[in-house]
UniProtKB/Swiss-Prot annotation:
Pfam families named in the record: Ribosomal_S5, Ribosomal_S5_C
Keyword Transcription: no
GO terms for cellular component: small ribosomal subunit
Biological function: With S4 and S12 plays an important role in translational accuracy. Located at the back of the 30S subunit body where it stabilizes the conformation of the head with respect to the body.
Location of the S5 DRBM domain: 18-81
Domain of life: Bacteria
Keywords associated with the record: Ribonucleoprotein, Ribosomal protein, RNA-binding, rRNA-binding
Annotated protein name in UniProt: Small ribosomal subunit protein uS5
């Protein structure tokens, strides 16, 4: 069973300006001839507070080492999400496995209305106003992947206009 971090999730800000958050730590075991070998699997997210986000998972015999591996992987896999005044441009749906997440932009002052791992993602990437709903599986790994898939699918009005061969004014009405 994963130990999911709630409101008191371990968040650190490094000297490189990146925010790190640990989402879950799982104790896993491998059965070998001499018995069981215990190790720990960690799931983390890293963001810059300005729309860049990355997810990492690491596994090691000790918790700190697995968390460090996960943070390094998250830093290597960061990508940029276009934000508009601390929220998204439009509603997106993300899916991974049995998890589906619905992420909607929100008006200024709404705050981050999201549960579990989704809240950690929005906090480290600098989203201030968003409403997100998790549907299906609540497995932390699947929820994080579904959220990131949804964020990757979000487009700016200029990207939508370029895709349709129109101007931004025509798209926005």
């Amino acid at each position: 069973m994963a130990k999911v971090q709630g409101k008191g999730a371990a968040e650190k800000e490094n000297d490189d300006g990146l925010r790190e958050k640990m989402i879950a730590v799982n104790r896993v075991s491998k059965v070998v001839k001499g018995g069981r070998t215990m190790s720990f699997a960690a799931l983390t997210v890293v963001g810059d507070g300005d729309g860049r986000i990355g997810m990492g998972k690491g596994k090691a015999r000790e918790v700190p080492v697995s968390v460090q591996k996960a943070m390094e992987q998250a830093r290597r896999g960061m990508f940029k999400v276009a934000l508009k005044n601390g929220t998204l441009h439009h509603t997106v749906v993300g899916k991974h496995g049995a998890s589906t997440v619905l992420i909607s932009p929100a008006a200024e002052g709404t705050g981050v209305i999201a549960g579990g791992p989704m809240r950690a993602i929005f906090e480290v990437m600098g989203v201030r106003n968003v409403v997100a709903k998790s549907l299906g599986s609540s497995n932390p790994y699947n929820m994080v992947r579904a959220t990131l898939n949804g964020l990757r699918a979000s487009l700016t009005p200029s990207e939508v206009a370029a895709k349709r061969g129109k101007t931004v004014e025509e798209i926005l009405g």
